[in-house]
């Protein structure tokens, strides 16, 4: 019915305009003929001025008709509701442009599509920047329902996202940075890998096992602590190393109840200095109380590390644990350290350290990360020197937001100085901010080798990283610089 009505209206308008035009032409011709007796040099009819017609005339429409006289099918197009999402949501100026009815119909249609199309983590079907990704059932269980689908923020529009009315920018951003939760502490093998939850993992058969039910291996058990005391005598240029005691040490059950245990120390100079304590009978708290003195200049000591190896002498000589500390803070003031003993590594242990600077710029809503220097870097097995670079990834709620890297520089005497500054913008929706910093080496054959990594967050397993993050967040605009030992995994 609607199609026939519109068709008849179009025909009526077309033929009405044609008859009107013919009548006006006849009237002009009769008037000119009656006045031809008194007028000389009447111009032809074709030269009479006619008001230009707006739109299409009859001849144009008739020329488009088929030559065989077939009837042209007139089809009424189906109209659908459409809506173009503004670039910035939540601004009243954009919302006022929509009428109430259109806004209501859009909201109803959006709710219907969201509820019928996908029953998982919420996302915006009208967001033109959204890219659909398939989530396996296991991954959908790992992420909480309130996690929103995020994108890699790189455009100017994203970086200048406006705040909602009535929100306090500084207090809100500081709250997001400081209130991180344990449920999003995850491990990433690389920037492109899928994060694995710390609460459960899948074995090779695909079954989930809680960490509480997994038996810890020898590399994961707490192997005790070694207490030492350091002092530097500036007048005699001597370092005094006192091995105090070893507590809560564990050893293989095949070694019996009371094996004899000794401590071996190494000053990692260009020509290493070794020393060894006397053997003591194994117990829960082994008292050594032995002091070792070496005449070495302070500036040489502050560039090396002091490593310890815990060894059994009877019934079998074997290294059951090791630990180390940096002598950078060595001074004339006597300091006592409690070192955590870890399982001995079958490969060379990563001793690399990285100097980082952080600054929370609350006014500009961004975090400034400085990659300053690295030391104790591994040496090459070939005469050619290695080159090093650092990769930095910023995660929010377990998802990668930004990734950057430094330039490639050659090492000199086991040290590299970058002095580079990276800027990471923040927005209101980003929570549980975590930085993953990885150090890589590159050989002459362009092969990349992983050296070590460091997590900087409130829940990092590195105490220095936790302290630096807390000091950065609680003191905006202050640059906090600290050295960190990299973890090999």
From Swiss-Prot:
A motif (Nuclear localization signal) lies at residues 446-448. The modification Phosphothreonine is found at residues 213, 215. GO terms for cellular component: nucleus. It is found in: Nucleus. The modification Phosphoserine is found at residues 82, 155, 167, 173, 210, 217. The keyword Nucleotide-binding does not apply. Keywords: Nucleus, Phosphoprotein, Repeat. The keyword Phosphoprotein applies. Residues 191-210 have a biased composition (Low complexity). Residues 189-214 are annotated as: Disordered. It comes from the Eukaryota. It holds the Pfam family C2. Residues 222-341, 343-470 form the C2 domain. Its main location: nucleus. Gene3D superfamilies: C2 domain (2.60.40.150). This is Tandem C2 domains nuclear protein. The gene is Tc2n.
């Amino acid at each position: 019915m609607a199609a026939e009505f519109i068709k008849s209206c179009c025909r009526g308008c077309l033929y009405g305009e044609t008859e009107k035009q013919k009548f006006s032409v006849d009237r002009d011709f009769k008037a000119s003929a009656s006045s031809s007796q008194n007028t000389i040099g009447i111009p032809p009819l074709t030269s009479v001025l006619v008001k230009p017609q707006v739109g299409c005339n009859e001849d144009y429409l008739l020329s488009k008709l088929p030559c065989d006289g077939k009837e042209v099918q007139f089809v009424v197009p189906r109209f659908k509701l459409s809506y173009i999402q503004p670039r910035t949501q939540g601004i009243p100026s954009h919302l006022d442009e929509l009428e109430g009815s259109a806004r209501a119909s859009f909201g109803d249609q959006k709710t219907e599509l969201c509820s019928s199309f996908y029953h998982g983590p919420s996302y915006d079907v009208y967001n033109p920047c959204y890219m659909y990704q398939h989530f396996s059932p296991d991954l959908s269980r790992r992420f909480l329902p309130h996690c929103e689908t995020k994108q890699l923020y790189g455009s100017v529009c994203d970086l200048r996202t406006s705040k909602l009315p009535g929100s306090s920018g500084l207090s809100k951003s500081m709250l997001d940075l400081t209130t991180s939760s344990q449920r999003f502490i995850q491990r990433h093998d690389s920037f492109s890998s899928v994060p694995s939850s710390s609460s459960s993992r899948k074995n090779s058969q695909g079954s989930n096992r809680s960490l509480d039910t997994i038996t810890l291996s020898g590399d994961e058990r707490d192997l005790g602590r070694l207490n030492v005391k350091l002092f530097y005598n500036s007048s005699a240029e001597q370092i005094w190393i006192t091995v105090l005691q070893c507590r809560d040490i564990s050893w293989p059950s095949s070694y019996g109840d009371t094996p004899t245990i000794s401590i071996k120390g190494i000053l990692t100079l260009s020509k290493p200095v070794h020393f060894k304590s006397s053997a003591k009978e194994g117990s829960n708290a082994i008292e050594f109380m032995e002091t070792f003195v070496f005449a070495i200049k302070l500036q040489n000591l502050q560039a090396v590390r002091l490593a310890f190896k815990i060894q059994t002498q009877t019934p079998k000589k074997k290294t059951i644990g090791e630990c180390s500390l940096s002598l950078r803070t060595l001074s004339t003031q006597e300091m006592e350290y409690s070192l955590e003993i870890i399982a001995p590594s079958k490969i060379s242990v990563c001793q690399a350290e990285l100097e980082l600077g952080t600054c929370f710029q609350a006014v500009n809503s961004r975090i400034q990360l400085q990659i300053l220097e690295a030391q104790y870097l591994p040496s090459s097995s070939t005469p050619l020197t290695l080159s090093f670079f650092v990769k930095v990834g910023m995660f929010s709620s377990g998802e990668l937001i930004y990734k950057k890297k430094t330039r490639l520089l050659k090492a000199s005497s086991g040290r590299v100085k970058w002095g580079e500054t990276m800027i990471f913008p923040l927005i209101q929706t980003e929570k549980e901010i975590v930085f993953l910093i990885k150090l890589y080496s590159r050989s002459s054959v362009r092969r990349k080798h992983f050296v070590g990594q460091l997590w900087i967050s409130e829940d990092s397993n590195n105490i220095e990283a936790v302290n630096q993050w807390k000091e950065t967040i609680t003191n905006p605009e202050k640059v906090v610089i600290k050295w960190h030992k990299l973890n090999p995994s």
